[in-house]
Structures are given as structure tokens and as C-alpha cells.
Amino acid sequence: MPEPQEGETFAFQAEIAQLMSLIINTFYSNKEIFLRELISNSSDALDKIRYESLTDPSKLESGKELFIKIIPNKEAGTLTLIDTGIGMTKADLVNNLGTIAKSGTKAFMEALQAGADISMIGQFGVGFYSAYLVADKVVVTSKNNDDEQYVWESSAGGSFTVRPDSGEPLGRGTKIVLHIKEDQLEYLEESKIKQIVNKHSQFIGYPIKLLVEKEREKEVSDDEAEEEKKEEKEEKKDDEPKLEDAEDDEDKKDKKKKTVKVKYTEDEELNKTKPIWTRNADDISQEEYGEFYKSLTNDWEDHLAVKHFSVEGQLDFRALLFVPRRMPFDLFENKKKKNNIKLYVRRVFIMDNCEELIPDYLNFIKGVVDSEDLPLNISREMLQQNKILKVIRKNLVKKCLELFEELAEDKETYKKFYDQFSKNLKLGVHEDSQNRQKLADLLRFNTSASGDEYCSLNDYVGRMKENQTQIYFITGESIDQVKNSAFVERVKKRGFEVIYMTEPIDEYVIQQLKEYKGKQLVSVTKEGLELPEDEAEKKKREEDKAKFENLCKVMKSVLESKVEKVMVSNRLVDSPCCIVTSQYGWSANMERIMKAQALRDSSAMGYMAGKKHLEINPDHAIIETLRQRAEADKNDKAVKDLVILLFETALLSSGFSLDEPGTHASRIYRMIKLGLGIDEDEPMTTEESSSGAAAAAPASGDAPPLVDDSEDLSHMEEVD
């Protein structure tokens, strides 16, 4: 046996070292998932070499047979997994097994510490490290076509070594040797390995072979029998001596021939099940679908729903699609590999990251598509232009929407689905004009009439009042915020239902979804809100417009370019005023969302931010008193300051942010001082403030007038 060559030692990246420490030092009951993860990694490696060989058959010259082999060795206490996949170069071993953390490493540790199941490990891309659940030392030997054979080795002590391997050549692929912990030796038992493979990996697309020990009867002569017995005795040492002696006595009586039991090893294939998607859907149980789903996705939970169908005619393909129970942690990451649908051609795996197969908004759907018509050696470039693929994609979208409609028939199941994937449906409304109305049917919202229950747009339309022609909605940060908003006061008081849209993506939905079933969607936060009115209400509104026309002009002259116009409102009940935006600009909520974008286009803020309109409530005491003050003296500086204060407060209550919050705060503090009767022109010492506070307060409970009696000046700073 050749001497092992000297290797290089590397430290594990900090997050990986933490993860390994967590795996090793925490008790987990379902350690068996380590085998599922290693088999899944082997399957991925085999997929890669098979895909490369479609365009370059010479890639398989280093080993044509594609398989996974498991070898338990009780004497040595090791479990070995061998695959003939693509293998790893030295750089792959160093980077992938220790020095570069996957994006999921930290997320998985956080999930674990929050009480998540260890079996989630594969979903976070760190399944290899689950080997340390049962092993105290792992040795990985790997050979890639582009490099020499290397060995990676670690006992998880914070570092690993990589060295060239001059041992038995693999040809191509990877061999993982797990040195099993003393308390985990059950994983070397044939029955245990078979049980785990059957449970987790029976639908892997490559043969999984287990090296098993068997016995057979063999007829031998006396001399050969003696030789066999001697060998057995040496192997068993002194176990069962009396039984051996008795058998020896019997052997001596047989003078010519003897039948003996001979032990031998052979490979036994553990996954002979034919691909589940090629079978008739009526013959497949929910348990079988569940096992296949878990094998396909490494999910630890059952799927929520499944759609199994075939299309025949001009185009032949079969598909099996699953909806998971929960959203993946990295569902909307830009650099996330789209690998949820595996593409097969005539049962041969082609690729698992075919972006042309399904639109982005359905990227949570997992499954298999098997085409009879695509060429086996199709390249990525050809796929982009392929008409067959476009037809397959159209059918997949159609079947997914059918599946969601079926889910919607059961309220509870649909709520589970919607809580996880509502953003995807809304993204679909924004992106998929062809299926926009079908997707709109699937949307659910809270409304002013639905309480805690979700409500569909169809339900809303069904409850609309006879004289109601529009669908009213409001966007905002939270249910509590929009529920108590000034904008919904009049609409709710008149008995009209308002839809509450509180997710940032809702703003994008309504940019595309202008109407539903012939009813226009109208934001109660924008100008142009028209509520059905009778003649008396119309008459009162005209009178209010005339009565407050002068105040509107005064307020506009004070606020200048801060608002486009000031007008009498038909939407307010309890609030004195509010800020609405122009029909085609951003709402306050959209402006907030855009300001939060790290890579936003600042120039867009100027022309997309909606023009602000200040609406005043003619029935509110503050507005009526302000009108009287303005009528008495339109140059009253107190009126000017109060208008600015009202405007800034309305900005905040309407969902906008202040450009100068410091100035607004100073203005509020001055109002508080006025309310407490403190003369801000006189500086106060601490002693004076403590002894004279009571004397400074006015005798009556009323706050002092804003304008000083001796001077026609406001104590509040005049703001240009």
C-alpha cells in the first residue's frame, strides 16, 4: 500500500465550523437523514456528468456505468458510499467542503436554534455535514476528469486536510468513507440501510447498490470441506466451539461428498421502482406521491397538493407537479438557482435549472417534466428558442392554476397555501397578462367587512351595494394602520366595504389590475374618489365648496408648492384634513416603499411621487375656526403657522414622511410651551423651572391664545 502523501490543512469557514459543532454536540433523534443527504448529493453529481456527456460523450470514457454503491464494513466500523458522478477537483474539495459557506449555512443554523428539524438540512445546501451525525471522521476521495485524484479528510476539529491520492484509482467519481461512532453502529446493518433507502431514496434515478453478504450451499469433497471448516474456525475464532466440534464429527462420517454453506458478497439493487410519473395516476397512492416528493426535494414535510397529468397529441409529455407546505427561505433571492422542476427526455434526466420551463412567479412549484419530443442532446441555447418548450410551459402554467383553483375549494387548505405563496400569485398578476384575471380570482384580502377572514374579489363584488359602481381599496403598512386611516372614514360610514392591502407587492398588483369583473378598482387615498350621493348631499357639498373657498386659497398661498391644490373633502368624518395624491402618481405607501429601495433611481422620485392635494373637512371644528380666523384677517400669522402644522400632521397621518422632522418637532414643542404658559423668550434656570412651574400655568384650564394680546405676532416661528 503506497504511503499517504503530505497534504495541506485548511480551517473551516467560521459559520461551517459552528454548524458542525451544532451537529456534533446536539442530540438529534432522526440521524438517519445523513444517508438521504449523501445519496442525494451523489445523484446530483451523476446528473451533472450525464448532462455533460450528452454534448461530449468522451466525458464518460472514464467510467460508462452510472451508479451509487453503499458498502458497510462492520469489522472496520466504516460505511462507504461510492458514486461514478462528475467528481470534485482539488479546488472543489477545498471550497465546497469547508472554506466557502453556502448562503443557507447561517439561515439553517438560525432555523435549528429556533427549534427546526435537522432533516431540513438538505434544503439549505449543507447536507454533506449531516455525515457527522453518525461519524466522527469522514474521508472523501474524489476524481474529476479535469484533475488528479485527491483525498479530503476531517474529524471535525475545526480543520480539514486535502492531499493527492496515490491509492486505488476511482476512474471518475467520489468515495465517501464514514468512520461510524461507536453508538451508531446500527447504520452498518443491511436491514437498517435498506429501510432508510426505501424510505427516503427509492425514487433516485440511478441504481443504488448495496454490498450484501449472502450464503449458498456448495457441494465439496471431504478435503475441501475440511479446508472450508478450518477457514470458518479461523474467522469465527472460538465462537460456538461445541457446535463446530459436533459438525466436525458428522463431517468425518461422510466419506465422499459434503454440502456446506459458503458466504459470499454481491451487489443488490435497492431502488428498482420504475419512475412514478410514467405510471397511471389512479394506481399511485398518496403515500407513494409523498415518498417521491420527499426524495425529489429533500423536504422533511409532506407536500400540500399534487397534480399528475399527461398531454398527448401534437406534443407528448408527462408531468408531476407538487406544491410544498411552506415557502423556501430563499424563494425570492435573485441569484437563487431555479432547480425545482427536473426536465427529462424519454426518462433521461437533462437538467434541473431550466428557467424557460416555468415562469418566475411559479418558482415554488416542484416536480418532474418528461418529454417525448425534445432531442436528447438539447443545449441551453436551443432550449431558449425551442417551440416545444414554450408549449410545455403554457400547459404547466394552466395546470398550476387549475391546481390552485382546486385548493381554493377548501378554505382551510387554501389559507395554508395563501399564507405561504400569496406573493407569488401577486407577482403573477403583475407579470402574466394572459392569466391575470384567473390569478385575480385567487387573490385574498382582509376587508372592512370580513374581520379576520380572507375575502376574494369575487366575494367583495357579490356584497357590493346596489348603487356602488367601484371597488374601494386602501394600501398601507399594516391592517391596524389602514383600518384607522382618515381615508376610510366616510366610505365605511356610508356602508361601503374597503379592501385592505398591506403587502408592499400589492402596490404593484394594482398598477396592473385596473378592474375586476367590469368594476374599476379605486384607491381611497387618491384624488377623484366619488361616492354615490343623493341630491341633498350634492347640494351641501356645493355649499361647503363656496363657504370654504377663501380658506382653501389662504392655505394654498401658505403652503405654496408643497401642495398642488387645497380642496373641500367628501371622504373625511373625524379628521380635520388629509393628504391625497394625484390619480397617476405614487401613493404615500408606494413612496415609502420606493424610498426604502437601496438601489432606487433617485431621479424617479421627482416625477413619480404623486402630486399632493390637501383635503379639508368642512364639518370639523378646527377647520371651521380656522376659516373664521382667516375671514377676519387673512394675514394672521397664527393662521399661517397652524396651516403648516395641520399640513405636516396630515402628511404623517396620511402615511408620508416629513422632509424636515426636526422643524416639525420644534413646532410641536413650542405648542406645548404655549399650552403650559411658558414664555420661551425668557431663559429659565433649573431652580426657576422647578419653583415657578405652578405659577407659570394659567389660572383657568384653557390654553392661552396662540397670538399674544399685546402684539399681533405668533410665538411660533414663521416658516417659509
Curated annotation (Swiss-Prot):
GO terms of molecular function: ATP binding; ATP hydrolysis activity; ATP-dependent protein folding chaperone; unfolded protein binding
Positions of ATP binding: 41, 83, 102, 128, 380
Membrane-spanning ranges: none
Segments for region (Disordered): 217-258, 681-720
Residue window of motif TPR repeat-binding: 716-720
Low complexity: compositionally biased ranges: 689-705
Domain of life, per lineage: Eukaryota
Gene Ontology CC: cytosol; perinuclear region of cytoplasm; plasma membrane; protein-containing complex
A biological-process GO annotation: protein folding
Keyword vocabulary terms for this entry: ATP-binding, Chaperone, Cytoplasm, Nucleotide-binding, Stress response
Short name of one Pfam family: HSP90
Basic and acidic residues bias locations: 227-244
Compartmental location: Cytoplasm
Domain notes for this protein: The TPR repeat-binding motif mediates interaction with TPR repeat-containing proteins.
Role summary: Molecular chaperone that promotes the maturation, structural maintenance and proper regulation of specific target proteins involved for instance in cell cycle control and signal transduction. Undergoes a functional cycle that is linked to its ATPase activity. This cycle probably induces conformational changes in the client proteins, thereby causing their activation. Interacts dynamically with various co-chaperones that modulate its substrate recognition, ATPase cycle and chaperone function. Required for piRNA biogenesis by facilitating loading of piRNAs into PIWI proteins.
Self-association state and partner proteins as the record states: Homodimer.
Record-given protein name: Heat shock protein 83
